[in-house]
Amino acid sequence: MKDISLRILDMECAACVARLDRALEKLPGVQRAAVNYTAASALITYDERVTDLAAIAARVKRAGFRVPVEEQDLLPAEADAETAAAAAAALRAVFGVKGVAVQADGTLTAYLWPIGVDGRDLAAACVGAGCAVTPGELRGGDADQELEKRMDLLKTLVTSACCTAPLMLEMHPKLQFLAGTALQFGPGRYFYKSAWRGLRNRTFGMDFLVSLSSTLIYLYSAYVTFTPRTSYKLYFASDGVLLSLILFGKYMEQVAAGEANSAIRKLMHLQPRTAMVQRGDTFVELPVDQIAEHDLVRIRPGERVPVDGTIISGQCAVDESMLTGESMPVDKAPGDKVIGGSLNRSGSAIVSAEALGKASVLEQIIQIVRQAQCEKAPVQRFADKVARWFVPGVIGAAALTFLIWYRRIAPRNLERALLTCCDVLSVACPCALGLATPTGLMVGSGRAAERGILFKSGAELENAYKADCVVFDKTGTLTNGAPALTDVCPCSGVQPETLVRLAAALEQCSDHPLARAVTAYAQQQSDAPLPPAEDFSYALGRGVRGTVAGAAVVCGSRTWLRELGIDTAALAALPDLHGQAKTELCVTRCGIVLGALGIADTRKSEAAAVVAQLRAAGKEVWMMTGDHARTAEAIAAEVGIDHVLSEVRPDEKAAAIERLRAQGKTVCMVGDGINDTPALAVADCAVAMGGGSDIAIESAGILLPSGNLEKLPELFDISRATIRTIRQNLTWALFYNLVSIPVAALGVLHPSICATAMSASSIGVLMHSLRLKDSGKKERRFPWKKKS
């Protein structure tokens, strides 16, 4: 199965989504399709053995829409006809390439399906065919298509306004007819085209209602123009105002939709176009597409990091807010990883390129956000059911309104009955209902991405809102995931520094995690070099021994010391480290006990505060771990967790989550290790912390790349704000239609007022969703919690 995000053109209203969804899902080989009107894209999963991109594009066209084609020029180093032909053949085999043309000057033009084909793949295919090329600028991308659509709509709006303006003046009826005809079949063609596409697929959208209303007004006015009666009015001007106002609403809707989709655009703009790459002995500026794996790239102050890689030399402070949501610069030194798209605040470094193109972290984030914005949340099902019957219902209501007015309220008054019927058609707004959920999800997931929280789907966002039970894995989630020296307990007369440095002198010869913890602590306490150790030996599970400064030193467990015949009575006066669930390392010199060191996997500094916030919000907090009960309870007590599941094997974790769900709880599992995978898979809401394994990340629907637990309350905050906004959108859309349609049927509204109200309802939904962009800017954690 293959997943693609395909850009779609000619979706003019939210009702188009259901039509295209059904058309794509009926195509053999397509497992699922999720269309997003606001993002103008479709997320499609299909079987490559059954169908292909050409068949999918053909089905999209048959449904009345278009799949645009991007153009990528590739400039060959040598303009040789035979080599160019071989390169063209190689390009045609690249996934996502629709066709290739060889220009007269030897330039290769690749025509691409809009699925994000990487220019590096195209260049690599050409190189494989013996033709080195330089990728040119991509034409017809997302930004180009969005600008083109907006400009076309603006031209149509201006033309409509220019045609309507003369109709507002006193004119001869036949001149009004000519101007009205130009208006109806000029700018009005915008609605006719969309309505016709819907009719061909037996679906009705807002544009069909507008076309029907406008056509009825036009035909009535045309009839009156050529009928020798003086008592009837012409409504060409009303028709023009109706079309112009709706076009204005459409244009404003496009502007607002562009703002709603700004998160992905901002992420894409983080990728610099060029970079300083080493070629020979010098660094030259090259397009990012020409960077290869292991190339050395120079990063200067104020520049964005062009690729994922490892620092080879130099030091810098990098702003990784695009990944973590936190703008505090992170110091980087040789050996540290840097992420493409992050901003170098200060310093200069040389980076060895590693992950390029679609393999980079930035590209993966963009794909996750795209997927989340296209996936439908469960709350969308209600809107889909209503929208399916909305337009036929409005047409029926309009027909009934006409009959009641023509036969009962104003008998034989065709003018009044027809205008009231058109009022009903004009005021109804299925788009507000169709936009309510996807715009909320788009803005909410985009805002979350800006804050370093990645939702993979709308369902995950909704489940996070519903979660009332949070289960933490211990190691690497509540704790730092690595042992650290926490206690220095010297015997009487022994200096703490002496105890630590003596143990570290011996442990520096070992690569055991406990040894690294001791050595790291000693180096933090003093810059002085550690004395060398001789005759070093390691006893598995017991400890280490050797000679330091001519004295025999032993560092290990009490049991081992007793086996070696060393008197451990002095340890009785020291704190009980075992009782605190810590590993005890006893240190002796020349057979005399000097003291003990306590080592433990320390809790994260923010863990206790986060748990307190979750509990204050009414969420039940659990900790699940494979550790012994004593260790688990010690950590739980430190962070404030009352419910502990200890000594749980990896294969038992999923069953533990299922038991909690069976009690009626909506469970959010937070983990990061490979043994969390089964539990993450069965939880209602699965959160993977940064640094987790690929398997864990695949099993989780929500990612916190920074690994910062403080993002968890913010996650719930954003999910709640998003679902609340969606519900308010749906309530407004339903309320508007339930009130406006009956009012219009009373005949008290002018068609222009109806058109204004209809446009305003859609724009209102979009603007209300855009308020989510401010979510999380203030330090508001769980604002729904009532103050006592």
Q: Where in the sequence are the language-model features?
A:
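Juxtamembrane coupling segments of multi-pass membrane pumps/enzymes
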Residues: 73, 77, 85-89, 236-301, ...
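Flexible metal-binding regulatory segments at protein termini and peripheral loops
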Residues: 1-171, 282, 363, 367-375, ...
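Membrane-embedded alpha-helical bundles of multi-pass transporters
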Residues: 200, 219, 223, 227, ...
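P-type ATPase nucleotide-binding
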Residues: 485-619, 629, 641-657
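Conserved cytosolic catalytic loops of P-type ATPases
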Residues: 31-37, 41-46, 95-112, 265-359, ...
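Conserved catalytic phosphorylation-site environment of P-type ATPases
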Residues: 323, 382, 419, 429-506, ...
